[in-house]
Amino acid sequence: MQKILIPLLIALTCHATFAASDAEKQAEDFTNLYNNTCIQYLADLDKLREKLKDLPTLPVEKAALFLAKEKGTAWIVPHQPEPFIIVLMDNRDYCAAFAHRADAAQVEKQYLDAMNRAPKEFTVVKSEDETETVDGSESHKLSYQWQLPDNPRKPTFILTTSTDPKAGLQAYIIIATVTDEE
């Protein structure tokens, strides 16, 4: 467990030292988490599974909430004040990260910075920017793709945030490779 836990915790905290507030630190930690897991390993999620194998997992019934009825695994990533969750689906190029508490504005700013740092051969395409209210709780959804000419496979990054302090999740990102046929 220490093989993955120590590097992951270092990655989560390396930039946090410079954060001006707890909200910024939480957003920075969340951003570091999905950058160092979902984005970094999107082309080889089996390698990410191997790195996560020693972290605790959610029981199947609780993991189902994060897996949208798909088969996969949800790992608990220790973090204060609350742990993060990393989810990988078994049969899809799909990785997601969840934060119970995070500053929506900071998470969105850091997400946009990450989207605009796509490798130079990719074109960045914004595909969604919507706000909706469900049961009195407002959420904001942003979606971007990194596209290559003549390539049907497109890394897609969907961020959803909420400013509602009662929301079960204030930030989550889904990172998946989709094809033109999907």
Regions found by a protein language model. Give the residues of each.
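Positively charged n-region of N-terminal signal peptides that target proteins for export
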Residues: 1-4
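Bacterial N-terminal signal peptides
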Residues: 7-15
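Processing junctions and N-termini across compartments
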Residues: 13, 31-32, 89
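N-terminal leader/targeting segments
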Residues: 20-85
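Broad, structure-driven detector of short, well-ordered beta-strand segments within folded domains
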Residues: 74, 82-89, 153-163
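Long, charged/polar, surface-exposed segments that mediate recognition or autoinhibition
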Residues: 79-141
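Glycine-rich, aromatic-bearing surface loops/beta-hairpins
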Residues: 137-182
